[in-house]
């Protein structure tokens, strides 16, 4: 298993802090958020990490992470234009090859780490495991609907009508079958390849897509 850490984006909502650094490098308790993300990746035993970078901030990320040896990781840098999370996976295909992988945002840390998610994904032989959390403003997120067994049956990006409050928070685990789904989707109205569309396509194709709901 590999990891794909998304460290692109311009961080416009965090300006002026992001005029001189990537948003993933903003410190929390004197440590960049990206450092915590890499801590969690390393704790799973994963060794190979692809870091998606943006043209504007990629060098800042490289200067901090370097070769990844600080975390006992081997890091490949993958430049990408901001064309959606599924496009990031598509861009990273040469690095990912046929391996399963954890994908997480470089500015987003889960309180319980990644180990339990990796264990569930591998034990149940899943094609996708999507981490969800209840939110109070579902119209601002991608929202998932589940069946009684915890399988995801439908995903909608920023729904205009009520369909629950289980939001996608930016942590995903995929088998190589995600590439088949990405090959079938088209850009959304905003010109991006959406990861929600790719996951929905996996569901439509009959792949095993489950959810894990965070309680904290």
Where are these regions (language model features)?
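Conserved donor-nucleotide/metal-binding helix-loop-beta segment in metal-dependent transferases, i.e.
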Residues: 112-140
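Conserved N-terminal catalytic core of the sugar/cofactor nucleotidyltransferase
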Residues: 2-5, 13, 26-27, 31-105, ...
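Catalytic-core segments of class I nucleotidyltransferases/pyrophosphorylases
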Residues: 102, 118, 122, 151-216
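Active-site glycine-centered loops adjacent to acidic/histidine catalytic or metal-binding residues
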Residues: 9, 107, 134
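Short alpha-helical oligomerization interface
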Residues: 19-24
